[in-house]
Amino acid sequence: MTGIDTLSSFRHFTDGLAPQEHLMPVLFVGHGSPMNGIEDTAFSRRWTQMAKEIPTPNAVLVVSAHWFTKGTKITAMDFPKTIHDFGGFPKELFDVQYPAPGNPILAKETADLLHSANVELDHDWGLDHGTWTIIRHMYPNANIPVLQLSIDRAATGEMLFEIGRRR
């Protein structure tokens, strides 16, 4: 998102967005085989249909089980790279790119909201296959900012539950 480099410019930008009257739903979606990212399957068709059944989000935050870190991190770059964190699959799967924008300002705001988890802004990771194999079916135009939140490998289930309760 170019041109949005201060909180006031971000607020000006968001003032022009359609208001969200309700909280967005929280979805738990497993990707199954990474091949679901490129094949027409019952899973991929359901992900496409699911996106039609819920309001279009202004951004998507994904907690990925494929990103275990020391501490909690959130992607905070303008354009997160597509990560192919698997092996033994056809070249066609490795060729997939999902060029969704990120949103560093929203990442910072999210980190601030989760202050008790000491969330660190990350500028290196990107979107792993736990994210893009699903999101590319839901939002194929890659025009909605996508942020990815890691799982702290030292966190207890209770700590992770508390992170999920924050709004």
Predicted features by range, described:
Residues G3-A117:
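A short aromatic-anchored loop/beta-hairpin motif
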Residues A107-L160:
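Internal, conserved structured core segments that host functional sites
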Residues G30-G32, G130, G164:
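Glycine-centered flexibility sites
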Residues R11, R45-R46, R136, R153, ...:
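Arginine residue identity/basic-tract feature
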